[in-house]
Amino acid sequence: MEYKYQFTAHAEKDLDNILSYLEHNLTSYTAVRNFLEELRLTMENICLFPNSYKLIQNKYINNIAIRKALIMQYILYYSIDSINKKIIIIRFSHSEQDADKFFKTMNINQ
């Protein structure tokens, strides 16, 4: 059964920041289109096969199972709500961002 998805407020803000950066700093509408297409394809895959992406382990998030998917140079972090058949998109980060620092400051409940 296919899952639905929902973005947290943090994930929406992260996505806005990514798109703004791609559009204004790279001045490339092609980069924006490519990112959005990769995001769409990744979301389709996650909704069909939610457990297929890598489960991450980090000392700062041991209370929830979080998976990650790479989209260009960004990482999409999500959790699975199996009861409600929902994918929760938690955050996005740049692939070169320090994961420990990111998870230490990340509030996954918002």
What are these regions (language model features)?
Residues N51-I83:
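Basic/aromatic recognition patch in beta-strand/loop cores that engages polyanionic ligands
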Residues M1-E38:
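Arg/Lys-rich, positively charged N-terminal/basic patches that mediate binding to nucleic acids
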Residues H24, S28, L48, S52-L55:
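Charged, solvent-exposed alpha-helical segments that act as regulatory interaction surfaces
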Residues I18, L22, M43-I46, P50:
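Hydrophobic recognition helices of helix-based DNA-binding modules
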Residues I71-I75, S79-Q110:
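Enriched for short, Lys/Arg-rich terminal
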Residues N34-F35, S52-L55, N109-Q110:
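Juxtamembrane/interface motifs at transmembrane-helix termini
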Residues D14, E38, T42-N45, K68:
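Residue-level recognition of specific faces of alpha-helices
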Residues M1, A65, K85-I88:
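Residue-level signal for beta-strand positions within conserved beta-sheet cores that form or flank
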